[in-house]
Amino acid sequence: MRSTFSYLIIPVVLMMGSVANAQVHFGSTTAYNATFVLDKGLSEDPRYNSTYTYQTSPIGFNFGVDIGKKFGLQLESILSNQGQIYDVINTAKEIAGSRKIDLQYIHIPLMMKFMGSGDATVRGNFNFGPQLSILNRGVESLVTNAGNFQIPEGVDFATIKQDFPSATDNGNGTYNIPQNIPSRDILKKELDDFKNTEFQLAAAFGLDIDLSRHLFLTTQIRANYSLTDMRNKDIINALQAGDYSDIFGGRANFIVGVQLGLHYYFGTLRSFGSRK
C-alpha cells in the first residue's frame, strides 16, 4: 500500500508546480474492454484456441492540469479486470476444457493530453503516455476433459506426463486423458509466478463534452499494451528449459475498450467562458 501511494503522489507533486498557471480538473471513470493475453506459445499450440474475452474497469480516478488550450497532463489510477480464456481443443477439434488467465491490475498512467484549441462545447482529444501496472490478483487455471490430444511440436510425452499423470501415449503423436481433470491452478500471484509490476504504454482518443460551467463528460476509445512478460523469470526459464508441457512464447497484455468519465473543472470551461 505504501509503494502504491508513492506511485500516485509523486507525479501529482511534480505536477503541482504548474497549477498556478494552469486549469485543474479531477474526475472518475468507468470502462468496458476487450482484453487479450497475447501468448505466442499458446497460439501455436494445437490444444488451445483463443476466445473473445470482455472485462470491466469498474472505477478509475484522475487528476489533470490543462496547460493552455492545446496541451495538458493527466495522472490516473484505474482498477482493471483483464485476462483471456482459451478453449482446450482435442484431436476431434472439439472443445474439451478451458484455460483461464484471470488478472486484476491497478493501472497508473501519466498521460499527455493534446486537445482541440477551439471553444466548442464538444472538443476532440488524443492522449498518450507511460503506465505503471501493479498486479492485484493473478490466477491461471486449467480444466481438461477426457479425450485424445495432440502432442505439440517440441514437447515430449515425458513432460506431458509430469503435468498430466494419468495421461497415456497413443504412439501416434497424440496422448489420451482417461477421465476429466477438474480445475487446477497453473500459476498464482501468491506463489510469485507473476510479476508484481509491469511497464506499459497507454493511448486514447475521444471527446470532451461540456455539460455546465464546471462539469464535463469524456468519451474515449482507449488501449494499453504491456512491454514486458507478465510471468516471473523462474517461470520463463522453466518454460524455455522444457520443464512444462507448454510451448514457450513471449506473453503480453493488451486491452482496448470504451471509457466514460465525469469531471469537475476548477474555473469556467472554455465553451461557457466564451459566451456573452
Model-assigned labels for residue ranges:
Residues 44-51, 93-100, 188-193, 244-250:
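Extracellular loop and loop/strand-boundary signature of outer-membrane beta-barrel proteins
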Residues 49-94, 106:
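Glycine- and aromatic-enriched membrane insertion/assembly motifs of diderm outer-membrane
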Residues 193-194, 198, 206, 210-276:
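Predominantly the C-terminal beta-signal and adjacent terminal strand-loop region
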Residues 22-60, 194, 263-276:
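Short glycine/proline- and aromatic-enriched beta-strand/turn motifs that initiate or cap beta-hairpins
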Residues 28-32, 59-67, 108-114, 128-132, ...:
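Residues on the lipid-exposed face of transmembrane beta-strands in outer-membrane beta-barrel proteins
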Residues 22-26, 69-73, 106, 120-126, ...:
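Outer-envelope beta-barrel architecture signal
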Residues 38-45, 80, 85-94, 138-145, ...:
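Outer-membrane beta-barrel translocator domains and adjoining extracellular loop/strand segments
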Residues 53-57, 102-108, 122, 195-201, ...:
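Residues that define the transmembrane beta-barrel architecture of outer-membrane proteins
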